[in-house]
From Swiss-Prot:
Protein's name according to its UniProt entry: NADPH-dependent 7-cyano-7-deazaguanine reductase
Localisation per UniProt entry: Cytoplasm
Database matches in PANTHER family: NADPH-DEPENDENT 7-CYANO-7-DEAZAGUANINE REDUCTASE
Highest taxon listed in the record's lineage: Bacteria
Organism annotation: Methylobacillus flagellatus (strain ATCC 51484 / DSM 6875 / VKM B-1610 / KT)
A GO-annotated cellular component: cytoplasm
Record-linked HAMAP family: QueF_type1
Function text: Catalyzes the NADPH-dependent reduction of 7-cyano-7-deazaguanine (preQ0) to 7-aminomethyl-7-deazaguanine (preQ1).
Length: 139
């Protein structure tokens, strides 16, 4: 696998496709460029999903996220593009991408985009776990 930015998302087979389970990822180093000014934008991405048959492979996700660093993107557009690409790659039962952009012009922007597979219903009383934000060091 390459160590260069790439739009290719790789997957692997869900090890337990008969069970709904929640995958939570925090991606603290997302960058892209403001399409108006060319200035860098920074965000923390939170990816939550319930896989069906496929899970996203982490290194390919890292390289995919890295591929946006030199692209001009509006916050709303890039959040939805990333979600759409992940949905195409993994076809999850449920996926939510939350993008928390750092302040620009005195305004913090948060964008939340969701996908539900047609016909999928969560089990009764299932709530996705809340995770505290993690630093790069786990204790």
């Amino acid at each position: 696998m390459s160590s260069q930015p790439s739009k290719a998302l790789e997957t692997f087979d869900n090890p337990t496709p008969g069970r709904d389970f929640h995958i939570h990822m925090e991606i603290p180093e997302f960058t892209c460029l403001c399409p108006k000014t060319g200035q860098p934008d920074f965000a923390v991405l939170y990816l939550d999903y319930i896989p069906d048959q496929k899970c996203v492979e982490l290194k390919s996700l890292k390289l995919y996220i890295w591929s946006f660093r030199d692209e001009g993107c509006f916050h709303e557009a890039v959040t939805n593009q990333i979600l759409d690409d992940l949905v195409v790659a993994t076809d999850p039962k449920f996926m939510r991408l939350t993008a928390k952009f750092y302040v620009r012009g005195g305004i913090f922007t948060n964008v939340v985009a969701e996908h539900r597979k047609p016909g999928w219903q969560p089990q009764p009383r299932v709530e996705l776990a809340e995770f505290e934000s993690q630093s790069n060091i786990r204790g």
